[in-house]
Amino acid sequence: MFPESFQIYFSEHQNLLYLSTLVLDLGLTVLMFRFFGKEGLLACIVLSILLANLQGPKLTVIFSMQTSLGVIFYSSIFFATDLMSEKFGKKEADRAVMMGFSISVIILLMLSISLLFLPSIQGNQTFSTEVHQAFVTILDFTPRFIIGSLFSYLI
């Protein structure tokens, strides 16, 4: 998706990639609030919960510590919920987070149903099987992240 030079640079500068992604995520949250108000914050909260849960299984090393990529998006969840609470009240912020978790559960359910479909045996069977296995791998961890996130929020 990105030019090869871009990929090479950031593969050698993972800490800078982390900080850039964090600034981009928080910056987009601010822009969404500026352009769309409460609905923009709601969209950011839902999107960040989804991204945090889907990217949670991917581990990397940032500043010499192993970490999940999901942590990047938790910062914008906290930022957006704090902003929503400040501007629109705690009840609206709680409602937005619960909507995000509800959508995560719905997406997880629908993606899990997709795993019941067998990979195609027509055409490129190897590719179909590899894609199916990739879905299985990602979705195997996602319920744990959704449940853990929900419990940590409720506590």
How should each PLM-predicted stretch be described?
Residues 1-84, 91:
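Hydrophobic transmembrane alpha-helices
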Residues 128-132, 149-155:
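C-terminal membrane-adjacent module
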Residues 140-144, 148, 152:
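Membrane-embedded alpha-helical bundles of multi-pass transporters/translocases
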